[in-house]
Amino acid sequence: MELQISSAIIILVVTYTISLLIIKQWRKPKPQENLPPGPPKLPLIGHLHLLWGKLPQHALASVAKQYGPVAHVQLGEVFSVVLSSREATKEAMKLVDPACADRFESIGTKIMWYDNDDIIFSPYSVHWRQMRKICVSELLSARNVRSFGFIRQDEVSRLLGHLRSSAAAGEAVDLTERIATLTCSIICRAAFGSVIRDHEELVELVKDALSMASGFELADMFPSSKLLNLLCWNKSKLWRMRRRVDAILEAIVEEHKLKKSGEFGGEDIIDVLFRMQKDSQIKVPITTNAIKAFIFDTFSAGTETSSTTTLWVMAELMRNPEVMAKAQAEVRAALKGKTDWDVDDVQELKYMKSVVKETMRMHPPIPLIPRSCREECEVNGYTIPNKARIMINVWSMGRNPLYWEKPETFWPERFDQVSRDFMGNDFEFIPFGAGRRICPGLNFGLANVEVPLAQLLYHFDWKLAEGMNPSDMDMSEAEGLTGIRKNNLLLVPTPYDPSS
């Protein structure tokens, strides 16, 4: 009897919610003319059915093939636009910028990033400009990236030691875990002065948060429904994660209030934020929550994107042995006899750098760059309404035959023939974004990919675990904001002897 009553209540609640949403849609004003084209919509859900069972970047690429590079998709209540060409992307990110410079808000980002009081997900504002300026000038300048060289060398040396131990025991290595630990340790020491307690747990929390922050939760699609927001099954999980994250970040903040200096004998980035917090000249007060959000940004942007790219590089090299052989030959010839390599040393590794570029073309760290319209604007002749969600399909543009010869083939040599970079000037190739919201940690992140990668290629030969063939490798992506591999990468290292 109790079960029947509970079922009846659930049915009534769902029916009531659906009725309200239908009434709201009926009352909507007549659509504006000259909106982007899109597929036929279903009542209430719009185009949500097109995403079911698929990764969003794949599903939206199919929409663009049929309806063009500026396409409208209705995600529940949310008017959304997918941009899939370099021309449309350039307009949105450069020509009409800052009209499209906001981030759209999701339940995941709002909870985990302290009401979006950070840099990554903050709306375009005085606060965002102030925090970004501090970030770039105090932590992520090219000069500072080079000054962190000894940290990279120390942490890579630690990684090589673990790999040699595993090789001596004949064991396969979970490279996913090892690379995550490496990037986390580098970022902790560079940004916070030392490797923090609970850093491994924080990395896992970041990974979970990013998987739930893409804006594709049901409550994100129907923001006006208080009931759906209340019933959102991931919301309670997010709040549990937020409480644990807050405890870890609060400990970091309190520890910095007590300590005298970081690893360099001077200020680290948190010390800088504390100093700026007391500065009467700053335009927007820096709250403790903003500092915590910044720390969480540093972990989410730094650890996840660098490790994701490094792992995809290694996966593609294992899948393409001839590319692996060519990259190793270059690294071993150029760096033979050298010790303590860092950023300047890897600049001469042209082929390895092309391998990294090719990896980011096929596996961008952020497959769909999220933006939001701050005001009505025009892109490619179409009207984009105020508050529209914009999704720039970086994954799709990286595989578009209009821009790339043999787009589904891993072919680093293509960059010998065509001059393209990822600094935000070639809009068909923007793994770090473009415009005023281009990733401020581009140089730092790239150094944390290229320097460890050169060491992995120089010091070890690699084979797949359990006798697997390259053609058997699973190259699937996981769901979420970042384009991480779905499965961990297990490899068997064999130390390389330069004298042999």
Curated annotation (Swiss-Prot):
The keyword Endoplasmic reticulum applies. Its cofactor is heme. Its main location: endoplasmic reticulum. It is a single-pass type II membrane protein. It catalyses: (4S)-limonene + reduced [NADPH--hemoprotein reductase] + O2 = (1S,6R)-isopiperitenol + oxidized [NADPH--hemoprotein reductase] + H2O + H(+). The keyword Transferase does not apply. The chain crosses the membrane at residues 3-23. Heme binds at residue 439. This is Cytochrome P450 71D13.
